[in-house]
Amino acid sequence: VFSTMMTDSQTTDVPSRPSIGVRIGRIAFLVVAGIVVIAVAAAFFVTWTIQRSFPQTSGSLELDGLSADVTVQRDSQGIPTITADTTGDLFFAEGFVHAQDRFFEMDFRRHVTAGRVAEMFGESQAGTDAFLRTLGWRKVAEAEVAAMDETTLGYYEAYADGVNAYLASRSGAELSLEYAVIGMQNPDYQPEPWEPADSVAWLKAMAWDLRGNIEDETERALLAAELDGGEGAIATPETQALLEKLYPAYPFDENPVIVPKITAVPEGGTDADAASATLPDDTGIQDASATIEWEETSSVIEAASILVGDVGEGIGSNSWVVSGSLAESGMPLLANDPHLGASLPSVWYQVQLKCSTVDDECPFDVGGFSFSGLPGVVIGHNQSIAWGFTNLTTDVTDLYVERIQGDQYWRDGALVPLEERTETIKVAGGDDIELTIRSTGHGPIISGLTDDSTAIADDPLPGLTADPATGAGISEVPGEDAEYAVSLRWTALDPGTAATAVFALSTAQDFDDFRAAASLFDVPAQNLIYADTSGNIGYQTPGRLPIRGAGDGWMPQPGWDSSYDWTGFIPFEELPVSYNPSSGYIVTANNAIVADDYAYFLSRDWDYGYRAARIVHLIERRAAVAPLTAEDMREIQLDSEMWIGKR
């Protein structure tokens, strides 16, 4: 036995010290162990943070605001089918499900459409907010909501109630992982309750995405100034001719138009009241008859387009429908691939909405694609009809060069007061910004907000529209001490009825109903194709399409001369329509709608029709061999041959 004992000299045995290597090993072990513990804890925290935002997709939930039980059945891909006894419960549930899956996307979108992105992400977004506030999408949406019929407003309110029911049960990162990230730089941010105007405003964003030729018009004006090489002069005929070469006309003799011949609609025309129970009584629809990309050019416009989800350069939408006479099934086949901007998550949200009993009180049994944040189904089919969209590419935007003198502008030889309003842009982590927005009778002044519109205002005359015979609009420029500015005239800046059309399309039962719904689909203007279970196919040009006085909007127009104003819009009953054409098919691919002898000006900036020509070729080639099938439609959609380089 080894033992020690105390002696008078107070001595003890002293253990030997570990070697340096052993001590380093112990320290390394402790460091590694600490790192592992921290990593495990971090992984647990991240997993917990992510998973707590996952929605409940099975079992039952008790929600205030429902009048009866609602069933939400998701398939293996998470696509929901919502079944309810009433329209109120149906759209309440759609709002709840959209919020479950996409609320951060919805919240972000409404900040974009309201010009409030800086509230979420700080000063870097203030310039984009200023541009979007100037356009005033949110104010237009609020005006549309105020003008809605009681039934349609009820759908939007029920949807908002459903979104808010989800918000009531969660907050912060429980709603979406992104809120945990935002909280790091903006800890005070809290999502607001959802409102109907939040939904309607997204249609304005889609109209911007599909706005047409504003970039082309801007580019031509800048090119005219560059090519002429001198300030203050009207573009020479040589410059005008060069621009015509750079932007050639549509090749009508080479590529197809959508409606070669306007065909008669079914006997009886279009009865607006027959469209569905969801339509207001005062739609004003009359019986119809058979009459008749450059890259983004400004940093702010580009930023707004990116936030919305721009279509990108060289991308276009396609749709076509073939009659049963060309199909193996003996029934029509409809294909549609609308090319909106790529985003994650997708701009589309697939859903099916079903009333337990389909009747006048609850008329919906529709499936297809919606926008998260918007009630209803935008593109899809019900039990009687199917429909699809492509961008109409008509010219619905014009730039006007204005002569500004102080707080007034020149108009037909007289000074008229500018309209002004002030808005406050709130900035996360920064000071509020006061924004003064000025407008003329044409629309908001955008020069000073975008580089290119400012460049046009600095040297506008070379790119200005003028009557080549008389020089009207430019021979007398008023106000020698005035300054130039650029304003925007755009159909989407006036209240419309597209928010109602979504429901009218979903409940349409035949071509008359479809056209009545199309008459409400004013902005964004879209090619609408149609098929029904009775074997009919059809097409309708809808939209608020301007009738111009002098000029055609190909270049900026002199705002001081009212002869260049829009004088109205093409009556719906005179817009192109096709019903069961003899060809047995209808193809739309952003190409020209009708021949150039149509009674009204539509655009000079069509897609040149090579995609449409290729689709027509494939349909005719395959139909000549055997009746078409759904697989044939899919293969045509996936076709990658580009004819512009071959013809």
Show the residue positions of the predicted features.
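N-terminal Lys/Arg-rich, disordered targeting/topogenic segments
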Residues: 2-24
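Second-shell loop/turn segments in exported
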Residues: 90-93, 130-131, 139-153, 489, ...
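Short active-site loop/helix that positions an aromatic residue
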Residues: 339-356, 508-522
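Ordered core of a single globular domain
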Residues: 214-237, 241, 249-250, 265, ...
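Hydrophobic alpha-helical segments
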Residues: 447, 451, 520-622
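Substrate-recognition/specificity elements adjacent to catalytic centers across diverse enzyme folds
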Residues: 7-8, 30, 43-333, 338, ...
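Compact, glycine/acidic-enriched structural inserts
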Residues: 359-443, 505
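N-terminal Sec-pathway targeting helices
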Residues: 18-38
